[in-house]
């Protein structure tokens, strides 16, 4: 799905599967691969602007209250900024600072010129990374990162299989 027309590609594959009767039947369907490692796990854990862990909606007062109590903080009732809107908002000045960890959008984004323009538009940009990437050229501060092999945790793949990672 990590392609300038990835969404359209997945929709086209889904439409073709539906046309030939391969949706809603056992052993059939479309399973597009996600663009980055552990995207599924991050989404499951609430790393999206519209949901908390377990895909519980931030706009639901009862859900928000539950997480406020568990986390001991007051939470914003509004949906946050989607990842695809961050760089356009940096260009317009709506986002003034950015912290990127473990990603090289200058290389991985389909529109490099757009990303560079956005990074240059920021007042302050922090990058945490293992290596000096193309994106690092635009950072005000570069912090050292750690690789998956240097920490413990889990990855959740596209089929929702959780894999444990040990040092």
Where are these predicted regions, by residue range?
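Non-catalytic alpha/beta scaffold blocks inside enzyme catalytic domains
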Residues: 1-26, 32-167
